């Protein structure tokens, strides 16, 4: 096993982080997939699981899956703080020159990480888009509307903006300072990175049905709005508006 110093790596290297909220059925499987994908890259790596206040055995399962490997660690929120805050914590916790994030629900094939990694040569941000989404109908409708709003309000250029399969050069976050606490954070990072002139590539990736468990970020399970809370929708719209005002004013720091 490579020696792990806990210090930022020089040159090539990648931090892979996964936000997790009540993912006890998936987290060990995803850590195993991540290990295999990262080993295939042939560079130093680390894995960070960002536990967003899980009430199940997510942390326990993570610790059991990572015994003896100091390259894998858990960063925990004391309470559920939302998807945007989980991403911000993951970015802040990353120690390697490249930062990659994906979901912890098994909907993405981490074998595609190699293709994303290859695109970094000509890019500072590699943003994937789902070739064929395997999500419930209402979620597809919501995502279509969200992407359409993002396209109109922020003048296009982004395909499948909320796809959780992205690679960033860590140094871009010396300038790009995300403030969003919800899912708007993906759009915020891409918009600010574009404003600073960072290079971006987009590639298609496979998408699958959720491996186990239920949708957990910003959801509830019953009623007409079967997967999105009204409060979460309001928060998203407010933060979209705030981001548009922020970019219009040039407040990008």
Regions found by a protein language model. Give the residues of each.
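N-proximal low-complexity "stem/linker" segments adjacent to membrane-targeting elements
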Residues: 1-36, 43
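A conserved acidic beta->alpha catalytic loop
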Residues: 51-60, 106
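Residue-level signature of catalytic and energy-coupling elements of molecular machines
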Residues: 27, 34, 90, 105, ...
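Hydrophobic helical membrane-anchoring modules
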Residues: 1-13, 155-156, 178-253
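Acidic donor-diphosphate engagement hotspot in glycosyltransferases and nucleotidyltransferases
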Residues: 30, 58, 87, 111-113, ...
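Acidic helix N-cap motif at the loop->helix transition within catalytic regions
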Residues: 25-29, 56-65
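Short beta-strand/loop segment that forms part of the nucleotide-sugar
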Residues: 43-54, 75-77
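Acceptor/aglycone-binding surface of glycosyltransferases and processive sugar-polymer synthases
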Residues: 71, 75-93, 98-101, 107-183, ...
């Amino acid at each position: 096993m490579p020696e792990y110093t806990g210090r930022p790596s020089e040159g090539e290297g990648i931090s892979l982080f996964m936000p997790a909220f009540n993912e006890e059925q998936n987290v060990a499987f995803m850590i195993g997939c991540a290990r295999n994908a990262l080993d295939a890259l042939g560079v130093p790596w680390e894995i960070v699981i960002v536990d967003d206040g899980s009430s199940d055995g997510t942390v326990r399962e993570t610790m059991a899956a990572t015994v003896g490997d100091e390259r894998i660690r858990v960063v925990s929120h004391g309470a559920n703080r939302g998807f945007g805050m989980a991403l911000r914590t993951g970015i802040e916790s990353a120690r390697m020159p490249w930062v990659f994030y994906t979901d912890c629900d098994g909907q993405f094939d981490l074998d595609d990480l190699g293709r994303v990694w290859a695109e970094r040569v000509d890019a500072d941000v590699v943003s994937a888009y789902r070739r064929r989404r395997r999500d419930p109908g209402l979620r597809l409708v919501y995502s279509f509307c969200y992407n359409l709003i993002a396209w109109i309000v922020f003048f296009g250029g982004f395909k499948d903006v909320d796809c959780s399969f992205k690679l960033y050069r860590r140094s871009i976050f010396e300038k790009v300072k995300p403030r969003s606490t919800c899912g708007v954070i993906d759009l915020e990072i891409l918009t600010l990175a574009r404003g600073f002139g960072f290079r971006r590539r987009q590639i298609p990736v496979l998408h699958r049905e959720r491996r186990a468990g239920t949708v957990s970020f910003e959801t509830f399970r019953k009623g007409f709005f079967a997967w999105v809370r009204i409060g979460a929708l309001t928060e998203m719209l407010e933060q979209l508006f705030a981001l548009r005002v922020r970019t219009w004013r040039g407040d990008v720091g």
